[in-house]
């Protein structure tokens, strides 16, 4: 007698990203026709392989979309004053509409202090304290890219979120905490009952086992296994680590035998994060055109479903 094992439905991020980037490209075309070339400046400190790779991806995408893409690279030995001087200069440059400081920075530097030197209107990562405060209050503003991308991914694949129990496993400033705020917003693509738990809680699986949606955001490879999940749960693999160029996700691939739907190891959340970066950037450029009627792209971070 043979038995078959169910496999979770895949939730790829590629189609979501393509839809968002098509909207961005249309807006870039309109801005350029009005005499504005959107410019996204990137800042990299040091030579971390993963960070260099990320910057190359973003610069390549910027060129494809029609953005100008100035880049500043500082040595790993750069001081806090060096980094903040660059950020301040880019903030004051009227030809630059968005600024991305690639994270992580070398350990002797304070990323948060550098972000405070940035004009909040040019914060395409959504990580300036002013913009995080706006998110907490439910006010419009740049949303952190990975949380916004996760909301969009779930909406595109028609995964119901409103009223469901969501557990975010991880409390980091770039994903776990802002994602909890995003998914608790009062709108159809969010409005969830969100619990944030982390590896400092000895019995964290007690929370994930009851969740209808689990978002892994801990940055601990292989942390989430099938026994940590409720059968049929939706699983989003947001947390990753790199060993050289090898991607090590939080969610073990064997979870696909228990989950009802799951993002793939490669091509899941990553593409939507990049797409949201450019959506934030084009909106920053659009805000400089105060005299023109804005194109009304949705502010929720969630494109329409399929």
From Swiss-Prot:
A GO molecular-function descriptor: methylenetetrahydrofolate dehydrogenase (NADP+) activity
Binding locations of NADP(+): 170-172, 199, 240
Region (Disordered): 285-306
Keywords assigned: Amino-acid biosynthesis, Histidine biosynthesis, Hydrolase, Methionine biosynthesis, Multifunctional enzyme, NADP, One-carbon metabolism, Oxidoreductase, Purine biosynthesis
Pfam family, any one: THF_DHG_CYH
GO biological-process terms attached to the record: L-histidine biosynthetic process; methionine biosynthetic process; purine nucleotide biosynthetic process; tetrahydrofolate interconversion
UniProt cross-references to Gene3D superfamilies, sorted A to Z: Leucine Dehydrogenase, chain A, domain 1 (3.40.50.10860), NAD(P)-binding Rossmann-like Domain (3.40.50.720)
Pathway participation: One-carbon metabolism; tetrahydrofolate interconversion
Catalyzed reaction equations: (6R)-5,10-methylene-5,6,7,8-tetrahydrofolate + NADP(+) = (6R)-5,10-methenyltetrahydrofolate + NADPH; (6R)-5,10-methenyltetrahydrofolate + H2O = (6R)-10-formyltetrahydrofolate + H(+)
Enzyme Commission code: 1.5.1.5, 3.5.4.9
Annotated GO CC locations: cytosol
PANTHER family per UniProt: C-1-TETRAHYDROFOLATE SYNTHASE, CYTOPLASMIC, C-1-TETRAHYDROFOLATE SYNTHASE, CYTOPLASMIC-RELATED
Protein purpose: Catalyzes the oxidation of 5,10-methylenetetrahydrofolate to 5,10-methenyltetrahydrofolate and then the hydrolysis of 5,10-methenyltetrahydrofolate to 10-formyltetrahydrofolate.
Subunit relationships: Homodimer.
Similarity comment: Belongs to the tetrahydrofolate dehydrogenase/cyclohydrolase family.
Protein name: Bifunctional protein FolD 1
Organism per entry: Salinispora tropica (strain ATCC BAA-916 / DSM 44818 / JCM 13857 / NBRC 105044 / CNB-440)
């Amino acid at each position: 007698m043979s038995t078959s094992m169910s496999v979770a439905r895949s939730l790829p991020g590629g189609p979501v990203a393509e839809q968002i980037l098509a909207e961005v490209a249309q807006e870039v075309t309109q801005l350029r026709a009005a005499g504005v070339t959107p410019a996204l400046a990137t800042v990299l400190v040091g030579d971390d392989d993963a960070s260099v790779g990320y910057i190359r991806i973003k610069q390549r995408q910027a060129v494809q979309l029609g953005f100008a893409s100035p880049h500043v690279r500082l040595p790993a030995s750069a001081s806090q004053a060096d980094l903040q001087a660059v950020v301040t200069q880019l903030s004051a440059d009227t030809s630059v509409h968005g600024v991305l400081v690639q994270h992580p920075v070398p350990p002797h530097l304070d990323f948060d202090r550098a972000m405070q030197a940035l004009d909040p209107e040019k914060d395409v990562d959504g990580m300036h304290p002013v913009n995080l405060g706006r998110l907490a209050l439910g006010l419009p503003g740049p949303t952190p890219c990975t949380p916004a991308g996760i909301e969009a991914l779930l909406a595109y694949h028609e995964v119901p979120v409103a009223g469901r129990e969501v557990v975010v496993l991880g409390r980091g400033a770039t994903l776990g905490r802002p994602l909890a705020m995003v998914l608790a917003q009062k709108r159809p693509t969010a409005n969830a009952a969100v619990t944030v738990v982390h590896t400092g809680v000895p019995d964290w699986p007690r929370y994930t086992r009851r969740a209808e949606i689990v978002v892994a955001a801990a940055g601990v490879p292989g942390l989430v296994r099938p026994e940590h999940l409720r059968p049929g749960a939706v699983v989003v693999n947001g947390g990753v680590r790199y060993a050289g160029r090898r991607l090590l996700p939080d969610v073990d691939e064997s979870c696909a035998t228990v989950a009802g739907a799951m993002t793939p190891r490669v091509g899941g959340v990553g593409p939507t994060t990049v797409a949201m970066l450019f959506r934030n950037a084009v909106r920053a450029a659009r805000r400089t055109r105060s005299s023109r009627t804005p194109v009304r792209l949705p502010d929720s971070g969630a494109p329409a479903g399929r």
